[in-house]
Design a protein with these regions (language model features):
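Amphipathic helical "hinge" segments at domain boundaries
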Residues: 60-122
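Flexible loop/hinge segments that line or gate small-molecule binding clefts
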Residues: 144-184, 297-309
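Short beta-strand elements in bilobed, periplasmic/extracellular small-molecule ligand-binding domains
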Residues: 100-119, 204, 225-247, 263-265
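Hydrophobic alpha-helical segments within soluble ligand-binding/sensing domains
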Residues: 177-204, 249-251, 300, 315-333
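N-terminal helix-turn-helix DNA-binding module of bacterial transcription factors
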Residues: 1-71
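Short, solvent-exposed amphipathic alpha-helices that sit
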Residues: 87-104, 185-189, 215-235, 277-278, ...
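Hinge/cleft segment of the Venus flytrap/periplasmic-binding protein
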Residues: 228, 316-358
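Hydrophobic alpha-helical
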Residues: 130, 136-156, 224, 235-301
Length: 358
């Protein structure tokens, strides 16, 4: 577990206005005029000041009252680390850091804990430890439905603020949720393959073991199946559950590609979140099969560029994490309570020609 304090985190790279004034040889009065968009400052000076503010990471303190009264707003983030989706923690971390940079000077503090996706009891222990330290506002990304129910029951009894990040809990609809509509994302994947496979064919759907009972992944699969029913030309092979790692995914696909022609897949809808492994197998066997999956990470960028992966359905996890922090912070600091509980992130499609924008 680690503490991340906005005001501490940036000390090494931020400068005060007085320090910036000395550095660029422009008075603080002039810098204040630029900050407040006052007249009487030349365009050249305005540009010099703006460049310096950006270079030295200056952030205006928009809540001086909080600073003067030494007010702090602590939010606890307890999320998972996953081998099959190891980019998740990295992207969420980027969003948390962005929120600290924006709200740290206004008193925001984040307490961060990450647990192994296969050891969900660690999440319960982390939440309990944070509660003992007085944290009453939480952002939670979970792996075990059973464990998160225990956590939510306790936190709700204690009137804690809660945002569920990336995965919702139907039994507790009164909490905030920031993430995608999984069912709709599955429908979108089916629509993509319908367009990529105009002649029809069979679709292979691999699913890793850890997602076998994941309600969101099953909802995504359900959306895919329901949309596919509208296309008589496409047939989904029985989902291939039980894949526990890279080797199993690789072997399952290799075996399927060696089957008789009437059993080979003509398209792949990936639910292993290891598109890198699937793309490598297709390249090694020199097979061009329409391949659709979710999320963008560095290991698959090349396979999108060469069209081994035809399309990705992308969600901006970093922006979701930032949004979750902002919602809680604005409620704690300004009393801004949102009536809307479900905050769905947009789904974007990434293909070869627009990859450069992501």
């Amino acid at each position: 577990m680690k503490w991340a304090k906005g005001c501490k985190m940036e000390e090494a790279s931020r400068m005060t206005l007085e320090e910036i004034s000395k550095k660029i040889g422009i008075s603080r009065t002039t810098i204040y005029k630029v900050l407040r968009n006052k007249d009487g400052v030349s365009e050249e000076t305005v540009k010099m000041v703006q460049d310096a503010l950006e270079k030295y990471h200056y952030v205006q303190n928009r809540n001086a009252r909080n600073l003067a009264m030494n007010r702090h707003y602590t939010i606890g983030y307890v999320g998972f680390r996953s081998k099959s989706a190891n980019y998740f923690a990295t992207e969420v971390g980027r969003g948390l850091k962005r929120a600290l940079q924006e709200f740290g000077d206004d008193g925001l503090t984040l307490m961060i804990s990450e647990f192994d996706v296969e050891k969900p009891s660690e999440q319960l222990a982390a939440v309990e430890e944070m509660r003992q330290q007085g944290v009453d506002s939480f952002i939670l990304s979970y792996s075990s439905h059973e464990v998160i129910l225990q956590i939510l029951e306790r936190l709700e009894k204690e009137n804690c603020r809660i945002v569920l990040l990336s995965r919702d809990v139907a039994e507790h609809p009164d909490n905030y949720y920031v993430g995608v509509d999984y069912y709709r994302s599955g429908m979108l994947a089916a629509e993509l393959l319908m367009k990529l496979m105009p002649e029809g064919g069979r679709i292979f759907v691999p699913v890793t073991e850890e997602y076998k009972t994941n309600q969101d992944i099953l909802s995504r699969l359900s959306g895919f199946q329901d949309r596919l029913k509208t296309c008589e030309k496409l047939e989904m092979l029985p989902p291939f559950f039980g894949l526990t790692g890279e080797r199993e995914i690789k072997e399952a696909l290799e075996k399927l590609l060696q089957e008789e022609p009437d059993r080979k897949p003509d398209g792949i809808f990936d639910l292993t979140y290891r598109l890198d492994v699937i793309a490598d197998v297709l390249k090694q066997q020199q097979k061009k099969i329409p391949l659709v999956g979710f999320d963008l990470f560095e290991e698959i960028r090349g396979s999108v560029e060469d069209s081994t992966i035809d399309a990705l359905i992308y969600q901006d996890l970093s922006s979701q994490a930032y949004r979750a922090v902002r919602m809680l912070f604005e409620e704690m600091c300004y009393g801004k309570v949102r009536s809307e509980k479900k905050h769905y992130a947009k789904l974007e499609i990434i293909m070869k020609e627009n990859l450069i924008y992501f």
